[in-house]
């Protein structure tokens, strides 16, 4: 009989526990047995996900980290790829990635970024993912798309 996969639990956190620092909070999550820390990416939801994820992996040894999810409209894919690669290096492979097309109108209002119709946002997210995948392959990237152009 095949052995079933171990069931894992993740937790979403966007600020430190009351009375604790961020470092203490993520260490407590690891001690409690959580497998993954998910950090949301909304302008009004506390900490920035990439910085919070980087801090979490340097404070823990087994806890995986992931954005829940990165809104592609707010960051260029080349910058996101670089930041995620850095977190992957710091964590020795404990990063998971989620990308999103954006849905929360207040994020767009508060940043002054126009909120395009859903189809445009989804197309941009798909292109964003293609660019990141190409960059992660480790070769020079020349890409011309509808939303992004990358050279070198």
Predicted segments with their positions:
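Internal, glycine-rich beta/alpha segment that forms the wall or movable "lid"
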Residues: 2-7, 23, 76-152
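Structural beta-sheet core signal
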Residues: 11, 67, 97-99
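Structured beta->alpha junctions
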Residues: 41, 69-72, 76
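Active-site-proximal loop/turn and secondary-structure-junction residues that shape catalytic pockets
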Residues: 13-17, 43-44, 71, 101-105, ...
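Alpha-helix-loop-beta-strand connector modules within alpha/beta enzyme cores
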Residues: 49-70, 124-131, 135
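N-terminal beta1-alpha1-beta2 module of alpha/beta enzyme domains
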Residues: 1-64
């Amino acid at each position: 009989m095949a052995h079933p996969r171990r069931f894992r639990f993740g937790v979403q956190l966007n600020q430190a526990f009351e009375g604790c620092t961020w470092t203490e909070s993520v260490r407590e999550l690891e001690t409690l047995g959580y497998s993954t820390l998910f950090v949301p990416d909304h302008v009004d939801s506390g900490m920035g996900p990439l910085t919070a994820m980087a801090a979490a992996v340097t404070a823990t040894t087994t806890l995986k980290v992931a954005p829940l999810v990165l809104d592609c409209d707010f960051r260029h894919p080349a910058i996101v790829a670089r930041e995620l690669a850095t977190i992957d290096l710091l964590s020795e492979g404990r990063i998971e990635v989620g990308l999103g097309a954006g849905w929360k109108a207040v994020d767009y209002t508060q940043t002054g970024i126009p909120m395009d119709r859903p189809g445009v946002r989804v197309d941009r997210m798909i292109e964003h993912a293609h660019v990141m995948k190409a960059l992660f392959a480790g070769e020079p990237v020349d890409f011309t798309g509808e939303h992004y152009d990358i050279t070198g």
